[in-house]
Protein backbone atom coordinates (compact mmCIF):
# COMPACT_ATOMS: atom_id res chain seq x y z
CA UNK A 1 0.00 0.00 0.00
CA UNK A 2 2.78 2.46 0.95
CA UNK A 3 4.69 1.71 -2.27
CA UNK A 4 1.55 2.22 -4.40
CA UNK A 5 0.87 5.53 -2.64
CA UNK A 6 4.48 6.61 -3.15
CA UNK A 7 4.25 5.86 -6.87
CA UNK A 8 0.96 7.78 -7.11
CA UNK A 9 2.49 10.75 -5.32
CA UNK A 10 5.55 10.67 -7.58
CA UNK A 11 3.35 10.64 -10.68
CA UNK A 12 1.37 13.61 -9.39
CA UNK A 13 4.56 15.55 -8.63
CA UNK A 14 6.01 14.69 -12.03
CA UNK A 15 2.99 16.15 -13.78
CA UNK A 16 3.15 19.38 -11.82
CA UNK A 17 6.92 19.74 -12.15
CA UNK A 18 6.80 19.17 -15.90
CA UNK A 19 4.35 22.06 -16.21
CA UNK A 20 6.51 24.34 -14.08
CA UNK A 21 9.64 23.42 -16.00
CA UNK A 22 7.86 24.14 -19.27
CA UNK A 23 7.27 27.68 -18.05
CA UNK A 24 11.04 28.20 -18.26
CA UNK A 25 11.73 26.36 -21.51
CA UNK A 26 14.12 23.45 -21.86
CA UNK A 27 16.44 23.92 -18.94
CA UNK A 28 18.29 20.65 -19.45
CA UNK A 29 20.07 21.74 -22.64
CA UNK A 30 21.86 25.06 -22.50
CA UNK A 31 24.33 24.19 -25.24
CA UNK A 32 24.53 26.06 -28.52
CA UNK A 33 26.60 24.09 -31.03
CA UNK A 34 27.30 27.22 -33.05
CA UNK A 35 29.26 28.84 -30.21
CA UNK A 36 33.05 28.89 -30.66
CA UNK A 37 35.32 27.49 -27.98
CA UNK A 38 34.73 26.65 -24.32
CA UNK A 39 33.55 30.01 -23.04
CA UNK A 40 35.23 32.82 -24.93
CA UNK A 41 34.65 34.67 -28.17
CA UNK A 42 37.27 34.80 -30.87
CA UNK A 43 38.41 38.42 -30.59
CA UNK A 44 37.17 40.31 -27.52
CA UNK A 45 38.14 44.02 -27.46
CA UNK A 46 41.44 44.49 -25.64
CA UNK A 47 41.30 46.28 -22.30
CA UNK A 48 37.50 46.28 -22.06
CA UNK A 49 35.88 44.46 -19.15
CA UNK A 50 33.00 42.37 -20.41
CA UNK A 51 31.09 39.18 -19.65
CA UNK A 52 32.19 35.79 -20.89
CA UNK A 53 29.79 33.12 -22.04
CA UNK A 54 28.32 31.29 -19.07
CA UNK A 55 25.69 28.67 -18.37
CA UNK A 56 22.13 29.93 -17.96
CA UNK A 57 21.37 26.75 -16.05
CA UNK A 58 23.78 25.42 -13.41
CA UNK A 59 23.06 22.55 -11.05
CA UNK A 60 23.70 23.16 -7.37
CA UNK A 61 26.84 21.43 -6.19
CA UNK A 62 26.26 18.97 -3.37
CA UNK A 63 27.75 21.44 -0.90
CA UNK A 64 25.37 24.10 -2.21
CA UNK A 65 22.41 21.73 -2.02
CA UNK A 66 23.19 20.95 1.62
CA UNK A 67 23.57 24.57 2.70
CA UNK A 68 20.54 25.65 0.64
CA UNK A 69 18.27 22.98 2.11
CA UNK A 70 19.43 23.91 5.61
CA UNK A 71 18.72 27.61 5.05
CA UNK A 72 15.52 27.10 3.07
CA UNK A 73 13.92 24.78 5.64
CA UNK A 74 15.52 26.64 8.57
CA UNK A 75 16.99 23.41 9.91
CA UNK A 76 19.35 23.30 12.85
CA UNK A 77 21.93 21.36 10.82
CA UNK A 78 22.53 20.42 7.21
CA UNK A 79 21.06 16.99 6.29
CA UNK A 80 24.42 15.45 5.44
CA UNK A 81 23.14 11.88 5.81
CA UNK A 82 20.70 12.39 2.94
CA UNK A 83 23.47 13.55 0.62
CA UNK A 84 25.61 10.48 1.22
CA UNK A 85 23.83 8.69 -1.62
CA UNK A 86 24.61 11.50 -4.09
CA UNK A 87 27.30 10.53 -6.56
CA UNK A 88 30.33 12.76 -6.12
CA UNK A 89 30.39 16.02 -8.02
CA UNK A 90 32.67 15.40 -11.00
CA UNK A 91 35.82 17.41 -11.55
CA UNK A 92 36.58 19.08 -14.86
CA UNK A 93 40.07 18.48 -16.21
CA UNK A 94 42.27 21.54 -15.78
CA UNK A 95 39.81 23.30 -13.43
CA UNK A 96 40.86 23.69 -9.80
CA UNK A 97 37.40 23.90 -8.29
CA UNK A 98 34.35 21.64 -7.94
CA UNK A 99 31.73 24.08 -9.24
CA UNK A 100 32.31 24.07 -13.01
CA UNK A 101 28.79 24.24 -14.47
CA UNK A 102 29.92 22.23 -17.52
CA UNK A 103 30.45 19.15 -15.37
CA UNK A 104 27.38 19.38 -13.13
CA UNK A 105 24.67 17.21 -14.66
CA UNK A 106 21.88 15.03 -13.25
CA UNK A 107 21.73 11.35 -14.16
CA UNK A 108 19.01 8.87 -13.24
CA UNK A 109 20.74 7.81 -10.02
CA UNK A 110 21.18 11.37 -8.78
CA UNK A 111 17.62 12.28 -9.73
CA UNK A 112 16.35 9.34 -7.72
CA UNK A 113 18.46 10.46 -4.76
CA UNK A 114 17.04 13.97 -5.04
CA UNK A 115 13.49 12.55 -5.02
CA UNK A 116 14.13 10.43 -1.95
CA UNK A 117 15.75 13.35 -0.13
CA UNK A 118 12.83 15.63 -1.01
CA UNK A 119 10.30 13.14 0.32
CA UNK A 120 12.29 12.62 3.51
CA UNK A 121 12.77 16.33 4.19
CA UNK A 122 9.15 17.19 3.41
CA UNK A 123 8.03 14.49 5.81
CA UNK A 124 10.34 15.73 8.56
CA UNK A 125 9.06 19.30 8.29
CA UNK A 126 5.35 18.69 7.69
CA UNK A 127 5.02 16.29 10.63
CA UNK A 128 6.88 18.54 13.08
CA UNK A 129 4.84 21.52 14.24
CA UNK A 130 7.91 23.45 15.33
CA UNK A 131 9.75 23.01 12.03
CA UNK A 132 6.67 23.78 9.96
CA UNK A 133 5.89 26.79 12.11
CA UNK A 134 9.25 28.33 11.22
CA UNK A 135 8.16 28.43 7.57
CA UNK A 136 4.54 29.56 7.85
CA UNK A 137 3.86 33.28 7.36
CA UNK A 138 1.56 34.87 9.92
CA UNK A 139 -1.75 36.61 9.34
CA UNK A 140 -3.87 34.29 7.18
CA UNK A 141 -7.12 32.82 8.53
CA UNK A 142 -8.38 30.01 6.30
CA UNK A 143 -6.27 27.00 5.37
CA UNK A 144 -6.47 27.92 1.67
CA UNK A 145 -5.22 31.46 2.39
CA UNK A 146 -2.46 30.12 4.61
CA UNK A 147 -1.43 27.67 1.90
CA UNK A 148 -1.29 30.44 -0.70
CA UNK A 149 0.78 32.65 1.58
CA UNK A 150 3.10 29.71 2.20
CA UNK A 151 3.48 28.96 -1.52
CA UNK A 152 4.32 32.60 -2.26
CA UNK A 153 6.78 33.12 0.60
CA UNK A 154 8.42 29.71 0.50
CA UNK A 155 8.41 29.69 -3.30
CA UNK A 156 10.33 32.97 -3.41
CA UNK A 157 13.03 31.44 -1.28
CA UNK A 158 13.04 28.03 -2.97
CA UNK A 159 13.26 29.30 -6.55
CA UNK A 160 15.24 32.41 -5.56
CA UNK A 161 12.71 34.73 -7.24
CA UNK A 162 9.00 35.63 -6.96
CA UNK A 163 6.65 33.03 -8.41
CA UNK A 164 4.37 33.85 -11.32
CA UNK A 165 0.61 33.67 -10.82
CA UNK A 166 0.50 30.44 -12.84
CA UNK A 167 3.21 28.90 -10.67
CA UNK A 168 1.37 29.84 -7.49
CA UNK A 169 -1.82 28.25 -8.79
CA UNK A 170 0.04 25.08 -9.84
CA UNK A 171 1.46 24.62 -6.35
CA UNK A 172 -1.96 25.31 -4.84
CA UNK A 173 -3.37 22.54 -7.01
CA UNK A 174 -0.67 20.31 -5.60
CA UNK A 175 -1.64 21.42 -2.09
CA UNK A 176 -5.26 20.45 -2.73
CA UNK A 177 -4.15 16.93 -3.65
CA UNK A 178 -2.52 16.50 -0.25
CA UNK A 179 -5.36 14.51 1.35
CA UNK A 180 -5.15 11.97 -1.47
CA UNK A 181 -1.39 11.66 -1.22
CA UNK A 182 -1.33 11.54 2.60
CA UNK A 183 -4.80 10.45 3.78
CA UNK A 184 -3.67 9.79 7.35
CA UNK A 185 -2.45 13.37 7.85
CA UNK A 186 -4.49 16.49 8.52
CA UNK A 187 -5.43 18.06 5.19
CA UNK A 188 -3.40 21.24 5.71
CA UNK A 189 -0.21 19.48 6.76
CA UNK A 190 -0.60 16.81 4.08
CA UNK A 191 -1.06 19.46 1.43
CA UNK A 192 2.02 21.38 2.52
CA UNK A 193 3.99 18.15 2.64
CA UNK A 194 3.22 17.58 -1.03
CA UNK A 195 4.04 21.21 -1.84
CA UNK A 196 7.38 20.90 -0.06
CA UNK A 197 8.19 17.76 -2.04
CA UNK A 198 7.31 19.60 -5.21
CA UNK A 199 9.59 22.54 -4.51
CA UNK A 200 12.50 20.35 -3.41
CA UNK A 201 12.24 18.23 -6.57
CA UNK A 202 11.76 21.16 -8.93
CA UNK A 203 14.54 21.65 -11.48
CA UNK A 204 14.10 25.35 -10.74
CA UNK A 205 15.29 24.60 -7.20
CA UNK A 206 17.98 22.07 -8.08
CA UNK A 207 19.38 24.33 -10.78
CA UNK A 208 20.23 28.01 -10.71
CA UNK A 209 18.28 29.29 -13.70
CA UNK A 210 18.87 32.71 -15.27
CA UNK A 211 15.84 33.67 -17.37
CA UNK A 212 17.02 37.08 -18.62
CA UNK A 213 17.71 37.04 -22.36
CA UNK A 214 17.30 40.65 -23.56
CA UNK A 215 20.69 41.98 -24.69
CA UNK A 216 21.75 45.62 -24.52
CA UNK A 217 25.10 46.84 -25.87
CA UNK A 218 26.24 43.27 -26.37
CA UNK A 219 25.42 42.21 -22.80
CA UNK A 220 22.43 40.64 -21.07
CA UNK A 221 21.76 42.48 -17.78
CA UNK A 222 20.71 40.05 -15.06
CA UNK A 223 17.58 40.89 -13.14
CA UNK A 224 17.87 41.75 -9.47
CA UNK A 225 17.01 38.27 -8.22
CA UNK A 226 19.51 36.67 -10.59
CA UNK A 227 22.20 39.01 -9.27
CA UNK A 228 21.18 38.11 -5.71
CA UNK A 229 21.46 34.41 -6.50
CA UNK A 230 24.87 34.83 -8.11
CA UNK A 231 26.04 36.77 -5.06
CA UNK A 232 24.77 34.30 -2.51
CA UNK A 233 26.17 31.20 -4.19
CA UNK A 234 29.48 32.92 -4.89
CA UNK A 235 30.02 34.29 -1.38
CA UNK A 236 28.03 31.88 0.82
CA UNK A 237 27.56 28.76 -1.30
CA UNK A 238 23.88 29.00 -0.40
CA UNK A 239 20.63 30.78 -1.18
CA UNK A 240 20.05 34.51 -0.54
CA UNK A 241 18.98 35.59 2.92
CA UNK A 242 16.06 37.89 3.69
CA UNK A 243 18.23 41.02 3.49
CA UNK A 244 19.53 40.10 0.05
CA UNK A 245 16.02 39.30 -1.19
CA UNK A 246 14.92 42.69 0.14
CA UNK A 247 17.77 44.43 -1.67
CA UNK A 248 16.69 42.72 -4.90
CA UNK A 249 13.03 43.60 -4.37
CA UNK A 250 13.84 47.25 -3.62
CA UNK A 251 16.03 47.68 -6.71
CA UNK A 252 19.25 48.17 -4.76
CA UNK A 253 21.13 45.62 -6.88
CA UNK A 254 20.60 47.58 -10.09
CA UNK A 255 23.65 49.73 -9.35
CA UNK A 256 27.25 48.83 -8.62
CA UNK A 257 27.25 50.53 -5.22
CA UNK A 258 24.23 48.51 -4.14
CA UNK A 259 25.86 45.25 -5.16
CA UNK A 260 29.08 46.31 -3.42
CA UNK A 261 27.24 47.13 -0.20
CA UNK A 262 25.59 43.72 -0.13
CA UNK A 263 28.86 41.97 -1.02
CA UNK A 264 30.65 43.66 1.86
CA UNK A 265 27.86 42.75 4.26
CA UNK A 266 28.02 39.16 3.08
CA UNK A 267 31.81 38.96 3.35
CA UNK A 268 31.46 40.01 7.00
CA UNK A 269 29.09 37.10 7.64
CA UNK A 270 30.58 33.86 9.04
CA UNK A 271 29.28 31.96 6.01
CA UNK A 272 31.85 33.72 3.82
CA UNK A 273 34.67 32.13 5.80
CA UNK A 274 33.81 28.69 4.51
CA UNK A 275 33.86 29.92 0.92
CA UNK A 276 37.18 31.72 1.35
CA UNK A 277 38.64 28.61 2.93
CA UNK A 278 37.33 26.40 0.10
CA UNK A 279 38.95 28.67 -2.48
CA UNK A 280 42.34 28.65 -0.79
CA UNK A 281 42.21 24.93 -0.10
CA UNK A 282 41.93 24.39 -3.84
CA UNK A 283 44.55 26.98 -4.80
CA UNK A 284 47.03 25.74 -2.18
CA UNK A 285 46.08 22.09 -2.83
CA UNK A 286 45.28 21.40 0.81
CA UNK A 287 43.56 18.07 0.00
CA UNK A 288 47.03 16.85 -0.95
CA UNK A 289 48.06 17.29 2.69
CA UNK A 290 46.23 14.05 3.43
CA UNK A 291 49.03 12.26 1.56
CA UNK A 292 51.65 13.30 4.13
CA UNK A 293 53.20 10.03 5.32
CA UNK A 294 56.73 10.70 6.59
CA UNK A 295 59.11 7.86 7.35
CA UNK A 296 58.92 7.58 11.15
CA UNK A 297 62.38 6.02 11.31
CA UNK A 298 63.88 9.04 9.59
CA UNK A 299 61.57 11.46 11.43
CA UNK A 300 60.78 9.92 14.84
CA UNK A 301 59.33 13.16 16.28
CA UNK A 302 56.34 13.29 13.92
CA UNK A 303 53.05 11.44 14.28
CA UNK A 304 50.30 10.21 12.01
CA UNK A 305 48.38 13.40 12.84
CA UNK A 306 50.83 15.64 10.99
CA UNK A 307 48.59 15.91 7.93
CA UNK A 308 45.63 16.97 10.07
CA UNK A 309 47.75 19.52 11.93
CA UNK A 310 49.10 20.98 8.70
CA UNK A 311 45.61 21.40 7.24
CA UNK A 312 44.41 23.09 10.42
CA UNK A 313 47.34 25.49 10.32
CA UNK A 314 46.51 26.44 6.74
CA UNK A 315 42.88 27.17 7.61
CA UNK A 316 43.76 29.29 10.63
CA UNK A 317 46.48 31.12 8.72
CA UNK A 318 44.25 31.98 5.75
CA UNK A 319 41.34 33.06 7.96
CA UNK A 320 43.63 35.28 10.00
CA UNK A 321 45.19 36.95 6.96
CA UNK A 322 41.93 37.49 5.09
CA UNK A 323 39.55 38.37 7.91
CA UNK A 324 41.66 39.02 11.01
CA UNK A 325 44.22 41.31 9.40
CA UNK A 326 42.25 42.37 6.31
CA UNK A 327 45.36 41.25 4.49
CA UNK A 328 46.47 41.03 0.89
CA UNK A 329 47.58 38.13 -1.28
CA UNK A 330 51.19 39.19 -0.69
CA UNK A 331 50.66 38.57 3.02
CA UNK A 332 49.78 34.94 2.30
CA UNK A 333 53.13 34.62 0.54
CA UNK A 334 55.32 36.52 3.02
CA UNK A 335 53.81 36.58 6.52
CA UNK A 336 55.75 34.94 9.37
CA UNK A 337 52.70 34.89 11.64
CA UNK A 338 50.84 31.59 11.82
CA UNK A 339 49.28 29.09 14.24
CA UNK A 340 50.89 25.94 15.62
CA UNK A 341 50.31 23.07 18.01
CA UNK A 342 52.94 20.96 19.74
CA UNK A 343 53.74 18.80 16.70
CA UNK A 344 54.16 21.72 14.34
CA UNK A 345 56.16 23.63 16.94
CA UNK A 346 58.72 20.81 17.01
CA UNK A 347 59.14 20.92 13.25
CA UNK A 348 59.42 24.71 13.27
CA UNK A 349 62.05 24.55 16.01
CA UNK A 350 60.03 26.60 18.47
CA UNK A 351 60.72 26.43 22.18
CA UNK A 352 58.07 26.68 24.86
CA UNK A 353 55.19 24.73 26.32
CA UNK A 354 52.98 23.80 23.39
CA UNK A 355 49.97 21.48 23.53
CA UNK A 356 47.52 20.00 21.05
CA UNK A 357 45.76 23.38 20.98
CA UNK A 358 46.74 25.84 18.26
CA UNK A 359 48.22 29.16 19.31
CA UNK A 360 49.48 32.16 17.31
CA UNK A 361 53.24 32.45 16.80
CA UNK A 362 55.75 34.34 14.69
CA UNK A 363 58.21 32.05 12.91
CA UNK A 364 61.91 32.74 12.46
CA UNK A 365 62.18 35.32 9.69
CA UNK A 366 65.55 33.93 8.65
CA UNK A 367 63.90 30.60 7.79
CA UNK A 368 60.19 31.09 7.10
CA UNK A 369 58.06 33.38 5.00
CA UNK A 370 54.48 32.69 3.99
CA UNK A 371 52.41 29.66 3.11
CA UNK A 372 55.10 28.13 0.89
CA UNK A 373 57.44 27.68 3.86
CA UNK A 374 54.78 26.12 6.06
CA UNK A 375 54.72 22.41 6.84
CA UNK A 376 51.62 21.63 4.78
CA UNK A 377 52.99 22.66 1.40
CA UNK A 378 56.49 21.33 2.05
CA UNK A 379 55.56 17.93 3.50
CA UNK A 380 52.83 17.25 0.94
CA UNK A 381 55.30 17.90 -1.85
CA UNK A 382 57.90 15.44 -0.62
CA UNK A 383 58.52 11.72 -0.53
CA UNK A 384 58.51 9.93 2.80
CA UNK A 385 62.22 10.68 3.22
CA UNK A 386 63.27 13.45 0.81
CA UNK A 387 62.03 16.82 -0.46
CA UNK A 388 60.41 16.74 -3.88
CA UNK A 389 61.57 19.80 -5.86
CA UNK A 390 59.85 18.47 -8.97
CA UNK A 391 56.33 18.56 -7.56
CA UNK A 392 57.08 21.72 -5.60
CA UNK A 393 58.05 23.39 -8.87
CA UNK A 394 55.06 22.05 -10.77
CA UNK A 395 52.74 23.37 -8.06
CA UNK A 396 54.19 26.88 -8.26
CA UNK A 397 54.06 26.90 -12.03
CA UNK A 398 50.44 25.77 -12.27
CA UNK A 399 48.84 27.22 -9.14
CA UNK A 400 50.70 30.51 -8.65
CA UNK A 401 51.83 31.38 -12.18
CA UNK A 402 48.91 29.83 -14.11
CA UNK A 403 51.38 28.06 -16.41
CA UNK A 404 50.11 24.61 -17.32
CA UNK A 405 52.71 21.86 -17.61
CA UNK A 406 51.93 18.83 -19.71
CA UNK A 407 51.92 15.30 -18.38
CA UNK A 408 55.35 13.65 -18.19
CA UNK A 409 56.30 11.05 -20.80
CA UNK A 410 55.39 7.47 -20.04
CA UNK A 411 57.80 5.03 -18.40
CA UNK A 412 60.04 7.61 -16.74
CA UNK A 413 62.30 5.71 -14.30
CA UNK A 414 62.33 6.60 -10.61
CA UNK A 415 65.07 8.77 -9.17
CA UNK A 416 68.25 6.79 -8.47
CA UNK A 417 69.79 6.37 -5.03
CA UNK A 418 71.81 9.39 -3.81
CA UNK A 419 75.13 7.53 -3.49
CA UNK A 420 76.62 10.41 -1.54
CA UNK A 421 75.00 13.16 -3.58
CA UNK A 422 72.55 15.84 -2.47
CA UNK A 423 68.89 15.62 -3.37
CA UNK A 424 69.36 18.52 -5.79
CA UNK A 425 72.23 16.78 -7.55
CA UNK A 426 70.19 13.61 -7.97
CA UNK A 427 67.21 15.47 -9.43
CA UNK A 428 69.38 17.58 -11.73
CA UNK A 429 71.29 14.66 -13.18
CA UNK A 430 68.11 12.67 -13.69
CA UNK A 431 65.94 15.37 -15.27
CA UNK A 432 68.21 17.92 -16.92
CA UNK A 433 70.71 15.81 -18.84
CA UNK A 434 71.19 17.37 -22.31
CA UNK A 435 69.23 15.66 -25.04
CA UNK A 436 66.82 13.87 -22.70
CA UNK A 437 63.07 14.14 -23.12
CA UNK A 438 62.70 15.68 -19.63
CA UNK A 439 65.24 18.47 -19.93
CA UNK A 440 63.14 21.04 -21.79
CA UNK A 441 60.51 21.33 -19.06
CA UNK A 442 62.58 20.57 -15.98
CA UNK A 443 65.52 22.86 -16.71
CA UNK A 444 63.35 25.90 -17.41
CA UNK A 445 59.87 25.52 -15.90
CA UNK A 446 60.01 23.06 -13.01
CA UNK A 447 63.34 22.65 -11.24
CA UNK A 448 64.18 26.38 -10.97
CA UNK A 449 60.94 26.88 -9.01
CA UNK A 450 61.46 23.80 -6.84
CA UNK A 451 65.13 24.06 -5.88
CA UNK A 452 64.74 27.17 -3.66
CA UNK A 453 62.95 24.91 -1.16
CA UNK A 454 65.92 22.56 -0.66
CA UNK A 455 66.45 24.08 2.78
CA UNK A 456 63.35 22.15 3.89
CA UNK A 457 63.30 18.40 4.46
CA UNK A 458 60.48 15.92 3.84
CA UNK A 459 58.41 17.09 6.84
CA UNK A 460 59.13 20.78 6.33
CA UNK A 461 61.92 21.06 8.88
CA UNK A 462 64.67 23.58 8.16
CA UNK A 463 68.08 22.22 7.21
CA UNK A 464 71.42 23.60 6.05
CA UNK A 465 73.05 20.32 5.02
CA UNK A 466 71.91 17.42 2.88
CA UNK A 467 73.69 14.07 2.92
CA UNK A 468 76.69 15.75 4.53
CA UNK A 469 76.91 18.58 1.99
CA UNK A 470 75.83 22.22 2.27
CA UNK A 471 72.38 22.84 0.82
CA UNK A 472 72.29 24.86 -2.39
CA UNK A 473 68.90 26.57 -2.64
CA UNK A 474 69.88 29.20 -5.20
CA UNK A 475 68.06 29.35 -8.50
CA UNK A 476 67.03 31.54 -11.42
CA UNK A 477 63.37 30.79 -12.14
CA UNK A 478 61.26 32.50 -14.75
CA UNK A 479 58.60 34.60 -13.03
CA UNK A 480 56.27 36.79 -15.03
CA UNK A 481 58.39 36.50 -18.15
CA UNK A 482 61.60 37.53 -16.38
CA UNK A 483 64.51 35.51 -15.05
CA UNK A 484 64.88 36.25 -11.35
CA UNK A 485 67.90 35.21 -9.29
CA UNK A 486 67.01 34.01 -5.79
CA UNK A 487 69.22 32.53 -3.10
CA UNK A 488 66.49 30.57 -1.28
CA UNK A 489 62.77 30.19 -0.62
CA UNK A 490 62.59 33.52 1.21
CA UNK A 491 63.90 35.35 -1.84
CA UNK A 492 61.49 33.39 -4.00
CA UNK A 493 58.52 34.31 -1.79
CA UNK A 494 59.44 37.99 -2.07
CA UNK A 495 59.85 37.70 -5.84
CA UNK A 496 56.47 36.04 -6.21
CA UNK A 497 54.79 38.59 -3.95
CA UNK A 498 56.08 41.52 -6.01
CA UNK A 499 55.35 40.16 -9.50
CA UNK A 500 52.14 41.30 -11.17
CA UNK A 501 51.74 38.06 -13.14
CA UNK A 502 51.48 36.13 -9.85
CA UNK A 503 48.78 38.50 -8.59
CA UNK A 504 46.99 38.17 -11.92
CA UNK A 505 47.01 34.39 -11.55
CA UNK A 506 45.52 34.70 -8.06
CA UNK A 507 42.80 37.01 -9.40
CA UNK A 508 42.14 34.67 -12.33
CA UNK A 509 41.52 31.82 -9.89
CA UNK A 510 39.03 34.00 -7.98
CA UNK A 511 37.13 34.81 -11.18
CA UNK A 512 36.91 31.12 -12.01
CA UNK A 513 35.83 30.16 -8.50
CA UNK A 514 33.20 32.86 -8.10
CA UNK A 515 31.82 32.36 -11.63
CA UNK A 516 31.93 28.56 -11.79
CA UNK A 517 33.64 28.49 -15.18
CA UNK A 518 37.15 28.70 -16.65
CA UNK A 519 38.59 32.17 -17.20
CA UNK A 520 38.71 33.19 -20.87
CA UNK A 521 39.86 36.12 -22.99
CA UNK A 522 36.90 38.27 -21.93
CA UNK A 523 38.25 38.14 -18.37
CA UNK A 524 41.72 39.42 -19.29
CA UNK A 525 40.97 43.11 -18.72
CA UNK A 526 39.59 42.45 -15.22
CA UNK A 527 42.46 40.08 -14.44
CA UNK A 528 44.99 42.75 -15.45
CA UNK A 529 43.28 45.49 -13.42
CA UNK A 530 42.98 43.37 -10.29
CA UNK A 531 46.51 42.02 -10.67
CA UNK A 532 47.93 45.53 -10.87
CA UNK A 533 45.97 46.74 -7.84
CA UNK A 534 46.88 43.65 -5.83
CA UNK A 535 50.58 43.85 -6.71
CA UNK A 536 50.69 47.52 -5.72
CA UNK A 537 49.32 46.69 -2.27
CA UNK A 538 46.03 48.54 -2.81
CA UNK A 539 43.71 45.54 -2.79
CA UNK A 540 43.06 43.46 0.33
CA UNK A 541 41.66 40.03 -0.48
CA UNK A 542 38.14 40.94 0.69
CA UNK A 543 38.20 43.97 -1.62
CA UNK A 544 39.45 41.82 -4.50
CA UNK A 545 36.44 39.53 -4.07
CA UNK A 546 34.09 42.53 -4.00
CA UNK A 547 35.67 43.85 -7.20
CA UNK A 548 34.98 40.55 -8.95
CA UNK A 549 31.32 40.33 -7.94
CA UNK A 550 30.60 43.96 -8.79
CA UNK A 551 32.26 43.72 -12.20
CA UNK A 552 30.35 43.79 -15.46
CA UNK A 553 31.22 40.15 -16.06
CA UNK A 554 29.39 39.12 -12.89
CA UNK A 555 26.18 41.18 -13.04
CA UNK A 556 25.64 40.70 -16.78
CA UNK A 557 25.84 37.70 -19.06
CA UNK A 558 27.19 37.21 -22.58
CA UNK A 559 24.34 36.89 -25.13
CA UNK A 560 25.66 33.46 -26.08
CA UNK A 561 25.53 30.58 -23.62
CA UNK A 562 28.38 28.37 -22.48
CA UNK A 563 28.15 25.00 -24.24
Can you annotate each of these PLM segments?
Residues 19-22:
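C-terminal motif of bacterial Sec signal peptides marking the signal peptidase cleavage site
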Residues 13-17:
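Hydrophobic helical h-region of N-terminal Sec-dependent signal peptides
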Residues 515-518:
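Axial heme c-ligation environment in periplasmic c-type cytochrome domains
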Residues 27-43:
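Short, low-complexity, disordered segments immediately C-terminal to signal peptides
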Residues 58:
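GGW-centered surface loops in extracellular recognition modules
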Residues 62-68, 72:
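Thiotemplate assembly-line natural product biosynthesis machinery
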Residues 1-12:
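Bacterial N-terminal signal peptides that target proteins for export
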Residues 24, 48-52, 70-440, 444-501, ...:
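Active-site substrate-binding loop specific to GH73 endo-beta-N-acetylglucosaminidase modules
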Amino acid sequence: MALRQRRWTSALLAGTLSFLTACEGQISDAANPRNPGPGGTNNPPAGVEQPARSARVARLTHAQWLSTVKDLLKLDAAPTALAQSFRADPSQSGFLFDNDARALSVDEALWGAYQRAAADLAGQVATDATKLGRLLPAGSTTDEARAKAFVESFGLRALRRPLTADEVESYLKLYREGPKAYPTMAAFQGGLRLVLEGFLQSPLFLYRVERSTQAADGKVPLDAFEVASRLSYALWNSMPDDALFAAAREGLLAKREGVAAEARRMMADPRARGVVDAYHQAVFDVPRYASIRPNTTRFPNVTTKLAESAAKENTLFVQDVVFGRKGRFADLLTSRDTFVNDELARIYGLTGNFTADFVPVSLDGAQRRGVLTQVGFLASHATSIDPDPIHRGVFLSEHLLCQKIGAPPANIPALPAPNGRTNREVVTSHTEAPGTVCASCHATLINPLGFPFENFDAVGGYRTTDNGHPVDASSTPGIGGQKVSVKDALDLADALATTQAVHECYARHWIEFLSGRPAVAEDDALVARLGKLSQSGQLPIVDLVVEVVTGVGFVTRHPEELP
